[in-house]
């Protein structure tokens, strides 16, 4: 790969958003910054969603209810993550950003752990549900 001597490369890097808990004004600022800066690369450091419904800590001291009671909350969490990523992706598309990196944070691993416990619902794995 040839080196681009003297060429400035721009990247926007974002940390934990924990949607739906994310600050909507901050997300608005991020999307505007993407469209103004027009970075070459976008890097998401993970923890896209709070994913409370997937958390192993949620039922640590109490009995876990049947799966049919958990799934509606899981769906809500996944939808919140998708909405956030769609909002950011829309700005990345407007800025013509082609290089995107996603690092899976600890909260983003929780859906994968949930699927490990319930392998018959693989659609909830993070990379399938939110990407």
Predicted feature residues:
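Core catalytic region of metal-dependent phosphoesterases/phosphodiesterases
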Residues: 14, 19-131
């Amino acid at each position: 790969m040839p080196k681009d001597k003297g060429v400035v490369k721009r990247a926007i890097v974002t940390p934990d958003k924990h949607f739906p808990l994310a600050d909507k004004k901050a997300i608005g600022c991020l999307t505007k910054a993407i469209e103004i800066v027009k970075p070459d690369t976008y890097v998401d450091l993970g923890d896209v969603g709070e994913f409370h419904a997937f958390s192993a800590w949620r039922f640590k001291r109490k009995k876990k209810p049947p799966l049919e009671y958990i799934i509606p909350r899981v769906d809500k969490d996944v939808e919140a993550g998708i909405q956030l990523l769609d909002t950011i992706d829309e700005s990345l598309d407007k800025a013509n950003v082609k290089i995107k990196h996603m690092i899976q944070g600890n909260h983003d691993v929780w859906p994968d752990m949930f699927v490990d416990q319930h392998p018959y619902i693989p659609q909830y794995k993070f990379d399938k549900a939110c990407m």
